[in-house]
Amino acid sequence: MSVRVRLAPSPTGNLHIGTARTAVFNWLYARRHGGQFILRIEDTDRERSSPRYTRNILAGLAWLGLDWDEGPIYQSNRIARYQAVVQQLLDQGLAYRCYVSEVELEAMRAAQKAAGKAPRYDNRHRFLTEEQRRAYEAEGRQPVIRFKIEEPLEVSWVDLIRGPITWNTQDLGGDMVIARADGYPLYNLAVVVDDIDMGITHVIRGEDHIGNTPKQILLYRALGHEPPQFAHSPLILNPEGKKLSKRDGATSVAEFQQMGFLPEALKNYLALLSWSPPDGEEIFSLEKAATMFDFDRVNRAAARFDWNKLNWINSQYIKQLSPAELVERLTPFWQAAGFDLGSVPDPTWLEEVACLIAEGIDRLTEAPPLSRFLFQEPLSYSLPALEQLRLPGVAEAMAAMATTLAAAELPQPVSADSLKPLVEEVAKSQGMKKGLLLKSLRAALTGDLQGPDLMASFALLQRRGWALGRLEAVQKVVA
């Protein structure tokens, strides 16, 4: 039997990080077993579904590189199929028309709450006579369709992550609605029909769906099909153990992309949320993970989102990029910061800038502020940098550095090593400690006291033709 799994997001919001983790698990399991990964868009909620959310979901999955084998299949294109199944269940006496109004349902729930009971539908319209049905219809009532749930009955399955689970039908809230009054199907019915028609063998989803599973198993049986195997992965919580929310920084894949995370790093981290590879490695491609993925190594406990770990993983992937790849990934962020990339000396210069700052960043968004001094002229100075330049003897030392630089015959292209003797010469001629000179040189060239490697930065600025001017500008800056 070929493994067939599916990801079935609802386009009622952007691609959530929890859905992305579910997508990763489905993709890994399908690839591990040489199966198929199907994408289904569950867009039957006409009030909340939106094409822009569908586009966001598709774009997010594509950015992550989670390729699907079939789909996207849209539930909204299959309404007639669901309605035919509803009619089949009605014809078989397994479902019925329920005319209970919303007001009556609210009164029923209020009475149950007052009696200390859990709210549930009391199946009051399961055995209506034809005369009673006609009377309700004469009132203008439009019925929903409810599926009969026999009670008491135990529904059991062996969850591939959580082990044996048993649910009593008395805890399912009574006969469930499977179609609205307008004929549109509800979630549990549409999901079961789709999974049957698409030959889904394994349903891998979040544990928040466990309560739907017994209802769906009953529908599978009513339709004459064996249910697929289920695997319910633990939820993703914030570092404090609470539900992940906007307050935690980001919840959608698009936000992580905008924050400067690489898709390879985010996939890697999502795979590690509740799962661990047998070799204990933390940096791996999804293709490698697919050779090791197994539900036996998925933890049942809720996963806590660890920003520090994600940042570290992302930094490792940034360091692995080639110079050309670094430039490609950084370009959108540089452009968003307003940097003119067309005015740089040459492509090699841009690659060297990328490699220089890659060592000091966890996210791509950190690159523009760290490299701003290499792209923007005139230079702006931080207050600590100005204070450094105003120290006794510093302005004179920078003037000497400018004179020495202007007179030097430097090999082309200028390198950090070719500039180091000039620094030694000025430190000696000015009687200044090298540490003080270097700190002052950083302030003069970069406008700050912290940043990437100073001599490499010096060389890049010299190749751009900006180093001499910045050294000469110190006298005016401190005046």
Swiss-Prot record:
One CC-aspect GO term: cytosol
Short sequence motif 'KMSKS' region: positions: 243-247
PROSITE patterns: AA_TRNA_LIGASE_I (PS00178)
Binding-site residues for ATP, renumbered to this chain: 246
Reaction(s) this enzyme catalyzes, per UniProt: tRNA(Glu) + L-glutamate + ATP = L-glutamyl-tRNA(Glu) + AMP + diphosphate
Subunit (UniProt): Monomer.
Record's function text: Catalyzes the attachment of glutamate to tRNA(Glu) in a two-step reaction: glutamate is first activated by ATP to form Glu-AMP and then transferred to the acceptor end of tRNA(Glu).
Stated name of the protein: Glutamate--tRNA ligase
Gene name of the encoded protein: gltX
